[in-house]
Amino acid sequence: MFFICSSLKEINLSSFNTENVISMSLMFFACKSLKELNLSNFKTDKLTGMEEMFYGCSSLKELNLSNFNTNNVTSMHSAFYECTNLKNLNISNFNTENVTDMSDLFLKCNSL
C-alpha cells in the first residue's frame, strides 16, 4: 500500500478500516523516512499475512502493536527486517501459535 514511499515521514491512519484485511504484507516496505506510526485503531482479526510489513522502516524508533490480533497469522517472514533504529517494539499480545514462517523476523534490528 505504501510500498517504497521513501519520503513518507508521517501518516494519519486513524480512519482506516482494516476489519476485512487478510494481508498487510509489504504495507510499509522501504518507508525509510517514516518516523512515527500509530496503528492502534487497526482491526486485525482476519489477518493472515504480515510478510515484510515494516521491512526497511529504518527511521522508526518505536512501534506499539499490542492491539494486533495475530491469532490467524501464518507468516511473519521479515516483518521487521532492517528496522535498524527500532528500540521499543510492543508485541506483547502476539499469538504465534499458527505462524509457520518467522524467518528473518528481526534480522538487522540492531537496536532492539
Q: Can you say where each PLM-predicted feature lies in the sequence?
A:
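Negatively charged
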Residues: M1-L112
